[in-house]
């Protein structure tokens, strides 16, 4: 079962999260992703142990502040006795004196942040969810081209890495080569390089190249959202594949249960693969924005035929 320790979480966000109490239990294990709003637990309506980090923000602070101190203590105890791995107090939780007094009994790690609840959701909660996400390893190259995460796939030796190197020379970003870790968050896909292979590429005839050293750190990126898959096809695969000449519709590919747009590009001598890949990304962006080149071509052709008929 996947898990994350409170200590690892604090180290990851040491610039915005501070441990203020319960340091003896900093190795507590987070077993459930997300951040838990704890209204029902505070009210004593739920009594199951909590596996995720509990969050106390503006709403909880206002609710507690309306109660006498002794009642505040009872309400806070309702939460702490469920032994959450940690409790994180947002910037809006202004006074934690009563909480810390009650926590002398329970010694739950109490974390204080200078972030609001919404900011925590985009940063800390996203990070926690990433640690629990199902990861699938795929063979290919992951790039960011014109701001779009592109997963480049194809048979071994077809020229994926060579095409990627051309794209890197055009200042597109490398996320990873060969072994790509893909994971799902909600209905979105993200990808990153395996830790060992990060920043490296294998080019046939040259061997292993350290892209970060050769081109600079600015040409690589930790991860990207995958929006597009492009498959490079050999001559044999091309003969067995079906192509729509006009390309009016976007094909879809299923990765980890998420459907993403998909292009197939046949490889042959005389074709500049990297430029075709760039064109595919531009076409994808145009279609996503509502413009379809094939449909415009069809409309122009139809208008021309109608003019000829009128004559």
Swiss-Prot record:
Residues at which Mg(2+) binds: 161, 202
A GO BP annotation: regulation of carbohydrate metabolic process
Residue segments, region Important for the catalytic mechanism of dephosphorylation: 266-271
The protein's required cofactors: Mg(2+)
Written domain comment of the UniProt record: The Walker A ATP-binding motif also binds Pi and PPi.
Further facts: Both phosphorylation and phosphorolysis are carried out by the same active site and suggest a common mechanism for both reactions.
Family note: Belongs to the HPrK/P family.
Protein known as: HPr kinase/phosphorylase
Species this protein is from: Mycoplasma genitalium (strain ATCC 33530 / DSM 19775 / NCTC 10195 / G37) (Mycoplasmoides genitalium)
Gene: hprK
């Amino acid at each position: 079962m996947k898990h994350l320790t409170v200590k690892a979480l604090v180290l990851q966000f040491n610039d915005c999260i501070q441990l203020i109490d319960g340091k003896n239990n900093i190795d507590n294990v987070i077993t459930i992703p997300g951040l838990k709003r704890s209204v029902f637990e505070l009210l004593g309506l739920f009594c199951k142990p909590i596996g995720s980090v509990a969050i106390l923000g503006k709403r909880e602070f206002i609710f507690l502040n309306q109660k006498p101190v002794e009642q505040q203590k009872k309400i806070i105890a309702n939460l702490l006795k469920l032994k959450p791995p940690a409790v994180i107090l947002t910037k809006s939780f202004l006074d934690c004196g009563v909480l810390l007094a009650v926590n002398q009994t329970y010694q739950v790690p109490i974390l204080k942040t200078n972030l609001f609840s919404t900011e925590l959701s985009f940063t800390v909660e996203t990070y926690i969810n990433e640690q629990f996400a199902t990861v699938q390893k795929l063979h290919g190259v992951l790039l960011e081209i014109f701001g779009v995460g592109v997963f480049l796939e194809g048979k071994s030796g077809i020229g994926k890495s060579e095409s990627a190197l051309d794209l890197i020379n055009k200042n597109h970003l490398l996320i990873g080569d060969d072994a790509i870790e893909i994971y799902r968050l909600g209905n979105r896909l993200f990808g990153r390089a395996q830790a060992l292979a990060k920043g490296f590429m294998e080019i046939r005839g040259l061997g292993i190249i350290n892209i970060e050293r050769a081109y600079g750190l600015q040409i690589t990126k930790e991860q990207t959202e995958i929006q597009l898959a492009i498959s490079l096809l050999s001559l044999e695969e091309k003969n067995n594949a079906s192509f729509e000449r006009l390309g009016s519709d976007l094909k879809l590919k299923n990765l980890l249960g998420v459907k993403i747009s998909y292009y197939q590009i046949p490889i042959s001598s005389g074709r500049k693969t990297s430029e075709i890949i760039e064109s595919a990304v531009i076409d994808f962006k145009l279609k996503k924005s509502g413009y379809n080149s094939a449909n415009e071509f069809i409309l122009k052709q139809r208008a021309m035929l109608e003019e000829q008929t009128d004559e």
